[in-house]
């Protein structure tokens, strides 16, 4: 039986190819979302370049409606990279609080129809986009904050930081090998939950 899986995230969900300066994507055959699109899963990719954790009521409402109307049996949410990258003074704990507010709204609207898998992105590494060691240290705290959030909300959690996801030269975006490793990690997480 083919189930719907909605993947809600940023450029790493979108499939951004960091070798492209104009927002290009990896071929579909490379993207982790497409690798999960099998006879078991019909994957809906709702990744967007530059997306951060939603904070405005209108943005949250639109996202919640997208998730609810998809009627997906499972929803993977992976955000937070842009928050920490673009706001150097932002603490990982604040990302956790923002994520909790967003996911509370999702849970109210979906009323348990969808299994939510909150996924902490793999930590950034020094690269063309990442030079401040403080940003990298904060990123290493994000998984713990998200795990606490998931526990409080009673939803599933996965830490992509333990999946060996290779990042490209910029220290932020998945390489082709990274997409494959991430797809395997998500598949394992979903298999253990459903």
Question: How should these model regions be labeled?
Answer:
Residues 45-47, 119, 159-161:
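Residue-level recognition of beta-strand->loop/alpha-helix junctions
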Residues 107-115:
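A short helix->loop->beta-strand "cap" motif at the edges of active sites that frequently abuts
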Residues 8-9, 118:
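Short hydrophobic segments within beta-strands
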Residues 42-44, 114, 154-156:
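Conserved beta-strand segments of alpha/beta enzyme cores
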Residues 170-194:
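Histidine-centered active-site loop/cap adjacent to the catalytic His
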Residues 2-6, 12-104, 127-129, 137-141, ...:
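Conserved SGNH/GDSL esterase-like catalytic core that processes O-acyl groups on lipids
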Residues 67-71, 110-111, 193:
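Glycine-rich phosphate-binding loop signature in dinucleotide/nucleotide-binding domains
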Residues 123-159:
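Substrate-gating cap/lid alpha-helix
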């Amino acid at each position: 039986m083919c189930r719907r899986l909605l993947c809600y995230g940023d450029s790493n969900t979108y499939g951004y190819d960091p070798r492209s300066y104009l927002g290009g994507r990896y071929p579909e055959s490379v993207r982790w979302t497409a690798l999960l699109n099998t006879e078991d899963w019909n994957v809906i990719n709702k990744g967007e370049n530059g997306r951060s954790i939603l904070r405005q009521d209108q943005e949250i409402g639109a996202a919640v409606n997208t998730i609810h109307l998809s009627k997906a049996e499972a929803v993977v949410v992976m955000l937070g990279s842009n928050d920490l990258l673009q706001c150097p003074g932002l603490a990982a704990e604040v990302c956790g609080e923002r994520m909790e507010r967003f996911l509370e709204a999702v849970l109210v609207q979906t009323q348990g129809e969808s299994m939510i898998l909150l996924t902490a992105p793999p930590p950034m590494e020094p690269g063309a986009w990442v030079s401040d060691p403080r940003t990298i240290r904060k990123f290493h705290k994000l998984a713990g904050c998200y795990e606490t959030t998931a526990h409080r909300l009673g939803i599933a959690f996965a830490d992509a930081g333990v999946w060996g996801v290779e990042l490209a030269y910029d220290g932020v975006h998945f390489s082709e090998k990274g997409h494959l490793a991430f797809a395997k990690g998500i598949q394992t997480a979903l298999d253990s939950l459903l």
